[in-house]
Amino acid sequence: TPAEVRLKKGDNELRVVFESQAMGDGQFRLQWSGAGFGFEPIAPERLSFAADDAELAQAHRLQQGQHLFAERRCARCHDYALSPRIGESAYGELDQSAPDLRTMGARVHVPWLAAWLREPHTIRPDATMPEFELTDAECDDVAAWLGSLGAPPPAPTFVAEDAAKGRVLFRQLGCVACHQFGEAMAAEPALAARIAIAHVPQKWHASALVAYLRDPRAHHRDVRMPDLRVSATEAHQLAAFLLGGTSAVLPPSRGDAERGRRIAQQQRCGICHDLDLPLDDRPFRRLQNLNPERGCLAEKPHDHDAPNHHLSDEQRASLRAFLAHATTAPFRRAPLDYAQRHLQAQRCTACHGFDGVPSTWARWVAVAGAKEPLPKDQDPVAQGVPALTWVGAKLQPSWLLRFVAGEQASPRPWLTARMPAFARHGGPIVTGL
């Protein structure tokens, strides 16, 4: 029911009683007006809340649990009754894919594959790939088999100026907002949380890296890397820069490919990844019968013959809390909730400020610019990269949907900063905003 209150000088406590609907988003408007201005939304920096509220903490715990449940692809293993419905989940969230491995040998070096299989979270702390209880020899075997799936095309030829131009592009396009590369600047938490990519020379065949930069989704529909729509020349220059970095030489990996194929089948890698392997139909434990203290959620999962997702205590608590809702909540379409979770997962705030918090890119510029003056085309603040605060109230949803999906030309083509395409997750995020 609409109601009005008169604000007094200083802080005001507002109490709103709201009963949400059974399905979809519940919503209401909180506006204000005063001398000289009509009704408008209250700016978020004018509002505060009790961060220690118990109900709010529980809601955040369930929200994180739902995101982890989808991100770690729990439904692919743990509920055959749910599996046929995975594609029916809201926004296809339970149907998130893992990389297609059927041509892995054409893209990635075998020694890196072996290192990744041993300890994925050492290479990338936020990896969604779990660690399996495999010996070093077994990791070498699986890497040898994956490496046999395809051969890399001839490597491109790089010249010195390619890497120099790639370094400029790396800054102009905002790659520094998500990635650490060739720098030792990690004092601020937001900058330290960026993805380190010093291992790129260890991982990629050169031709495959160029192709990946041009089309990140070619072998992974749900890859978190956005499509910056770089040209062939730009991809070539960026690859030259990234492959020119220094990284430790990995020891050679000499495994048995046939043994590796059998191990991959035994570990049921094909449940998450596209692989030309028959699937083992041994059932996993149903969601309703899971012991939340055992298996993947145990403190030591390998003691229970389960993969180790390297979950923190907080993440385990969130997943345990969410399990009771796992067969129903993912099928409710709630775009606001989806947007809140995926603004972080898709790293939207790496380039855009939000609710008064500057973007990671702007923070990087503040630190890097103090050491080395940066030209305007490498500064998101100078270029006017917009904040996301109230973007849903300012822009037409139909236009914004096309823009985020990469189907709408930029209204400011003279800027070097470039909005990437988020064809898979962009629609629900825009709807939520």
Place the predicted regions along the sequence by residue.
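Conserved, compact domain cores that house catalytic/ligand-binding motifs in diverse enzymes
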Residues: 54-91, 96, 179, 184-187, ...
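Electrostatic cytochrome c docking/interface patches
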Residues: 46-70, 148-171, 241-265, 315-344, ...
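Surface-exposed coil/turn segments at beta-strand junctions on protein surfaces, enriched
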Residues: 7-9, 21-23, 70, 202, ...
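Acidic/polar, compositionally biased interaction segments
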Residues: 1-59, 63
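Extracytoplasmic electron-transfer domains, predominantly the class I c-type cytochrome c fold
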Residues: 85-151, 186-247, 279-331, 359-433
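Surface-exposed loop/turn motifs at beta-strand-loop junctions within extracellular Ig-like
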Residues: 18-20, 34, 81, 150, ...
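Short pre-active-site segment immediately N-terminal to redox-active cysteine/selenocysteine motifs
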Residues: 70-76, 81, 128, 138, ...
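Repeat-solenoid scaffold signature
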Residues: 8-13, 18-24, 99, 134, ...
